Amino acid sequence: MELMPLAHKLCSFNCVYCECGWNEPVSHPVLPTREEVKAALEKKLAVLSGQHSVLDVITFSGNGEPTLHPDFLGIIEDTCALRDRYYPSAKVSVLSNSTQLGRPDVVQALKMCDNRILKLDAATDTMMRRIDLPVNEGLTVKTLMERLGQFHGDFTLQTCFLRGEHDGQSIDNTTPEEVAAWYEAVDRLHPKQIMIYVIDRKTPEEHLEKIPREEMERIAAPLRAKGYDVIVSA
């Protein structure tokens, strides 16, 4: 499900690794209305149901940050209602960068979903800002952690591991110091699932390195030993 403009990315992060490219300055982004989203989804679900097609999950992601949509709560309410009508066993999932968790309506909407896949790319302010380039330059890991804590572990934590350089600054969230800080964050949040992955497509910053699977497995191992459910995509 795409709630952002089709012609350009709209996001509260400007991640160096984002497959959608860099943010573009847009004064008045045009978003689909709640009514348009509902109508399009109902039409699609009706067709799929009529064809007796299998539907496992309805996922919100796409060309930016879906929770930026001003009617995100209403859209999720509509989606859950339509899901219940057409595919009651299907899940509703949202991929989010966690920046809008200070909004009660967004938190309420996410709690209605079956799967909340929430990002934390680094557990230090310096590395988080170098990787994610938040539009709100004052955003801190402490703030993100506090807001993620609202879900009491009932979410999937998503982290992209990478190395490289951007604007003359080193980027590496795989150093012992960065990984140790991230482990501490994981233990504080205690998510029900952890998803760690590597860059796999063209990135806006060209000077980035894909982390080998063996290294990703080494990062995952101590968490698995503690009983965490860790998915490695590499």
Segments from the language model and where they lie:
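Canonical Radical SAM [4Fe-4S] cluster-binding loop centered on the CxxxCxxC motif
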Residues: E2-A39
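Short glycine-centered, acidic/aromatic-flanked micro-motifs in structured strand/loop junctions
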Residues: L3, F60-G62, T159, V198
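Amphipathic alpha-helical segments in well-structured domains
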Residues: R34, I76, V179, P212-E217
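Short, well-ordered amphipathic alpha-helices
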Residues: K38-A46, I75-L82
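Short Fe-S-cluster ligation motifs
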Residues: A39-S61
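Glycine-rich beta-strand-to-loop/alpha-helix junction loops that act as flexible
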Residues: F60-E65, N97
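Conserved AdoMet/S-adenosylmethionine-binding subsite of the radical SAM
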Residues: L68-Y197, K202-E209
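Binuclear metal-ion centers of metallo-dependent hydrolases, dominated by the metallo-beta-lactamase
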Residues: P212-A234
